[in-house]
Amino acid sequence: MTCPDKPGQLINWFICSLCVPRVRKLWSSRRPRTRRNLLLGTACAIYLGFLVSQVGRASLQHGQAAEKGPHRSRDTAEPSFPEIPLDGTLAPPESQGNGSTLQPNVVYITLRSKRSKPANIRGTVKPKRRKKHAVASAAPGQEALVGPSLQPQEAAREADAVAPGYAQGANLVKIGERPWRLVRGPGVRAGGPDFLQPSSRESNIRIYSESAPSWLSKDDIRRMRLLADSAVAGLRPVSSRSGARLLVLEGGAPGAVLRCGPSPCGLLKQPLDMSEVFAFHLDRILGLNRTLPSVSRKAEFIQDGRPCPIILWDASLSSASNDTHSSVKLTWGTYQQLLKQKCWQNGRVPKPESGCTEIHHHEWSKMALFDFLLQIYNRLDTNCCGFRPRKEDACVQNGLRPKCDDQGSAALAHIIQRKHDPRHLVFIDNKGFFDRSEDNLNFKLLEGIKEFPASAVSVLKSQHLRQKLLQSLFLDKVYWESQGGRQGIEKLIDVIEHRAKILITYINAHGVKVLPMNE
């Protein structure tokens, strides 16, 4: 047992050593209990007074030591609590003059801020992408296209000639809109075919996930990038009466003639035809696959740099007539007769006296569904007989509205096939109208149609049409921004969804069949 070194502890030890044996002896003796309790209480009171005196002496010594410390004026006095350093470290305790360390009476707490992880919003955070340098290998007898491009098309006629499938029926110079002109702006070099735009800039077709949407094929993505990003090697008019222009794009073989065929081309239309881009994406989502790839592009050398739709030039389209802009001449009356004959359905070869064309019966059902959703009237209702047209509509401008009295003789327009595939149609000039009210929808487009494609109807009935359109249209950066971002795109989708509900109601009310059309 060690002896205490301080005076206070020595006294406590002495009292305890004397009192404890005597208390035990007193407790075990036979004295009266009253006297024993009195003695025990007196001893406890004496010890309690001693403890109080010890506490008072200790507090007095602590106050004197504080007065001897370094003096600080009240003007510069720190708060009574120590500050927590911003860097998360603690300062060492202050040292006394005698070399001893003053023990602080405050517990220091180091606060470590919680690291906030940024929100990864799909479609807004662009990951880093590896640069891939692919070398295109050309097959014998074909010219390789540099970068993301198309397979070389067969040789076409000169670009300054009348273009099949595009020329005469598309009078794109609108009243009050300035005609096309060449503007020397940024990214355009004067002199011959060198209107090259910078090729090192970021692609306008943005794909941030590992793969593109399933309804867009690899060829679709490659062609979209070709139209959106390739430099322009030449600019030629389609026809003297048309406002459209052919852009001869970079990507042909070195030394190739600057014309469509050896070089890839795109048909550049005016800003008012921007709905062509929406039509392309809707066609792919519905599984029709009848439109040509279309993107939106800012043409620095024309139209003051405003976004314009550019559609892939396809040299495989059949030649079109100048009056109806169609590869097959049909009137409304003959078209209704073809619908009754159901030409080529279920593999049946039509009889010679049936008057059938080479076009499959299901193609008309797909066209009618597509045209109704976008309210395209320039194919099946060129005279605007099924709705109330506006003054700026082509049928009013051309004076065709009074011809509705004889609808059977009204000619169909923009009925185009491919040379190597006459059974299927190609939907061109797909300018849609989103401002058509519900009471002014053109139901004439659905006359005579008794079947609709099951794949397209299933998409319209599902709850995923909006999601797919947003995902698909987001790929085209220029189109997305030109429509006001997501808010503007949502308004267009609202119109399509409402028309889809009306079409489903029409199908149920008229007993129209929904069939698989994957012939």
UniProtKB/Swiss-Prot annotation:
Topological domains, Cytoplasmic: 1-37
Presence of keyword Transmembrane helix: yes
Regions of this protein lying in the Extracellular compartment: 56-519
One GO CC term on file: Golgi membrane
Main location: Golgi
Stretches that traverse the bilayer: 38-55
UniProt KW keywords: Glycoprotein, Golgi apparatus, Membrane, Signal-anchor, Transmembrane, Transmembrane helix
Membrane topology: Single-pass type II membrane protein
Region (Disordered): 62-103
Subcellular location field: Golgi apparatus membrane
Pfam families linked to this entry: FAM198
Stretches with biased composition (Basic and acidic residues): 68-77
Residues modified by glycosylation: N289
Keyword Ribonucleoprotein part of the UniProt annotation: no
Protein family: Belongs to the GASK family.
Name under which the protein is recorded: Golgi-associated kinase 1B
Species name: Homo sapiens
Gene transcribed to yield this protein: GASK1B
